[in-house]
Amino acid sequence: WRLNKTIAGGGPLIDVGIYCIQAVCYITGATPLAVTAQSVPVSDKKKFIGVEETVYFQLEMPGGVIANCRTSFSEEIGYLKVNCSNGWFELNPAYNFGGLKMNTSDGKPFDVQITSQQATQLDSMALSVQNNKPSISSGEMGKRDMIILAAIYEAIETGKRVELKIH
């Protein structure tokens, strides 16, 4: 079903690329100002009908931060690396439901607390209805993500930088 655009809504960008976008927004505490993107020609035209196989995209963040992202159905990409002015950190694996392992440029161990993100989100939704309060994952966040995804697809189609106006 993941290779059927009608059912899935898109390819790896929609399926797993969203995790890259959310990680960048979370780590920087900001929303992208603009995007550029490229889609690699599919390797199997019978398999990848109407969906991309691999997408490279760049998120331009405030303060000159550039996030270089890649998502694919044919490559196993499961890491996140952040280069900072004073070093780097990485999660590898980054998107597993099980254990996460963080490495840092200074070699200091870093424990990553594991929680069930789905349980946390479902509990928040139930509590928000019960207590008439906002959920931790708002509709605004989902709207933001869809605007970014649409801009990435536009950048792939046009080959141009797409500015975002997200409020």
Predicted regions and their residues:
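Predominantly a Rossmann-like dinucleotide-binding segment in NAD(P)-dependent oxidoreductases
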Residues: 1-47, 159
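Short amphipathic alpha-helical segments at helix-loop
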Residues: 4-9, 106, 110, 134
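Soluble or luminal CAZymes and related metallo-dependent hydrolases
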Residues: 16, 117, 144
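A general structural signal for well-ordered alpha-helical segments in protein cores
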Residues: 20-21, 119-123, 149
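Generic structural signal for secondary-structure transition and capping sites
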Residues: 29-32, 66, 87, 134, ...
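NAD(P)-dinucleotide binding in Rossmann-like oxidoreductases
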Residues: 39-41, 45-54, 60-122, 166
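C-terminal helix-rich "cap/oligomerization" subdomain common to oxidoreductases
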Residues: 62, 110, 127-167
